[in-house]
């Protein structure tokens, strides 16, 4: 029985001697982990602070970077919306610009006397557009100033009429073009320059 007690006590001593080593190993492990992040653990007050400062900006920097990326996509859409030259290039703003142009064309028929044309329905009067404005809707206003582009044949859009019931075109446009209607049948209206 004495021998058994000694064996137990020896095993306890071994366990106690092993457990402090494991605890010392565990205490050594964090210290071994610390040097890779902080190269010199000899002066802990000064070195860990720079390491913490270096890790803190890295943690803070990723947050502002997405915030910086978020505003950057927003200004480019605002710039095309404010500049008239870039709006037609984007498909979405084209629709509002055409919608905005439609009320202008609705105002124009009042100044143009399409009522004198006997075939006013053929002059797109049903759409609320004067036949002089149809040409502007189908082609851009800068068509004549574009290099390499000739004036399209008006017979593509209108039939050749006899010239009667002429009234001056919208005051906004050049006075060289007139809104004229002929006495012919349907489709006898012509925009001539």
Curated annotation (Swiss-Prot):
Pfam families: SPATA3 (PF15662)
Ranges of compositional bias, category Low complexity: 17-35
Subcellular location(s) per record: Cell projection, Cilium, Flagellum
Tissue: Strongly expressed in testis. Faintly expressed in epididymis, ovary, spleen, kidney, lung, heart, brain, epididymis, liver and skeletal muscle.
Entry keyword annotation includes Metal-binding: no
The keyword Nucleotide-binding appears for this protein: no
Broad class of the protein's primary localization: other
Source organism superkingdom: Eukaryota
InterPro entries in the record: SPATA3
Disordered: annotated span: 1-92
Example of a GO cellular component annotation carried by this entry: sperm flagellum
Signal peptide start and end residues: none
Pro residues bias (residue ranges): 36-48
UniProt keywords, alphabetically: Cell projection, Cilium, Flagellum
Record's compositionally biased regions (Basic residues): 1-16
Descriptive protein name: Spermatogenesis-associated protein 3
Organism, scientific name: Mus musculus
Gene: Spata3
